[in-house]
Amino acid sequence: MNNHSETESSGHNSVHGNNDNIPGWNEELELAFSAYKGLYLAGRISSRHKTVCEVLVPGAVVQAGISGALQRIGKQPVVGDFVVLLDQPETGSRMVVNILPRRTCLSRGAAGDGGGEQLIAANLDTIFIVTSVGKDLNLRRLERYLAIVYSSGASPVILLNKIDLADDPARLVEKIRDVTGDVPVIPLSALSKTGLDALGPYLNPGETVALVGSSGVGKSTLINAFLGETVQKTADIRKDDEKGRHTTTVRQMFLLPNGAVLIDNPGIREIQLGDSAEGLEKAFSEIVDAARNCKFKDCTHRNEPGCAVLQAVRDGIIPEERLESYHRLTDELSFQSKKAEIGLKRLEKERYREMAVNIKKYRKFTGKP
C-alpha cells in the first residue's frame, strides 16, 4: 500500500494503536471489534497475495496469513475488508482470524463450470467505472458493469478517459447517458489531468473508491495523477486492436493525502453477472418501470399480449437494443443461477462420497461392521 505509514519489513514490533487511524474506521466497526481483547489487532486489507495479505493497522502496514478456520468455512478476506488479526509475538507472525461486517461488497460471477461468486473488493463508497475513447467504449459492457456495481451497494460513477483523442467528447458523453440514466458521467484525460477536479466530491477523507475497467483504459494513470507520483506502472495500447496490456496484476489500496482511499483493480476481461438480479433491475430501471403496466405479472417482455415494455419499444421510448441487452443479461443470470445450483449439488455429492469412504475406513480400522 502506498501511504504515509511505516511499512514493517522485518522483526516484530508492537503496532497496537488508535483504530481511528485506519482509513474508513467507524463506530460500528469499533463496536464489532470490542469483543476482541489482548493480542488481537484491527486492520484493513490493503493487498492480497494468495495466502498472504498486507494489512493496514494503526501506524504500519504488516503481513499476515489467513487462518485455517476461515479458509475451511470459505471466508476469504479481500482488499478493503476490515479484519481481526491475532498478534503472535512469540512466533513473530500475525494471522487474519475474522472479517468484520462488510457495508458493501463488489463481486462478479466466478469463471468456470461451478458458478458462484468471485469477490473483488469490500467496503466501497463509490466505484469509478473507467472506459475510454476508442474501441473500449462499449455500451453493452457498461450495462454489465452497472449491474454488478449496483448489486454491490456502492454508487457508480462513469469516467470517460482520453477525451483529448475524441473529436466530439460531448457526443460520446450523451451516448453513454442514453443507457446509464442518472449515473454521473465525467469526461477527463488522466494524462493531461483535464477534468480531474470533477472527481473531488467523490474523494472525501475516510471514503473508499474502487476503479474498475478493461486493461488500457487508464486506471493506473489515474492513480498516479491522484497521488502526484508514479506508483503504478502504465503501458501503451497495442496499435493493432487498441487493447491494453495488463500492468496492474493485484488489487491494491492507495491512501490519498487527504485521507481518501483508492483501490486499483487489474483489468477485467470478462464480466459475468453472478448474483446481480437487484443490480440488473437498477441498470435497466426504465424497463422495470414500464413492466409495472404489463397485463401479466410474469410477463417476459418477448411476445406476450398487453406487454407495456414491448409497447414502449414500438413507441420509441425504450431503444430496441436496450431490451435485447436486458433479455441477454436476464437469460445469463438465470443460467448462472442454475450453474451455481448444479455446482452445490455436485459439491454435496462429493462430500457424502468422502464421508462414506471415511466411515468405511473407520469400520475397517475398528473391526466394526
Swiss-Prot record:
UniProtKB keywords: Cytoplasm, GTP-binding, Hydrolase, Metal-binding, Nucleotide-binding, Ribosome biogenesis, RNA-binding, rRNA-binding, Zinc
Pfam families, per database record: RsgA_GTPase
Enzyme class: hydrolase
GO biological process terms, semicolon-separated: ribosomal small subunit biogenesis
CDD domains: YjeQ_EngC
Cofactor: how and how many bound: Binds 1 zinc ion per subunit.
Keyword Zinc: yes
InterPro entries tied to this protein: G_CP_dom, P-loop_NTPase, Ribosome_biogen_GTPase_RsgA, RsgA_GTPase_dom
Protein EC: 3.6.1.-
Domain of life: Archaea
Residues the entry annotates as binding GTP: 161-164, 213-221
Entry cofactors: Zn(2+)
GO annotation, cellular component aspect: cytoplasm
Matches recorded under HAMAP family: GTPase_RsgA
Name by which UniProt lists this protein: Small ribosomal subunit biogenesis GTPase RsgA
Organism: Methanosarcina acetivorans (strain ATCC 35395 / DSM 2834 / JCM 12185 / C2A)
Classification lineage: Archaea, Methanobacteriati, Methanobacteriota, Stenosarchaea group, Methanomicrobia
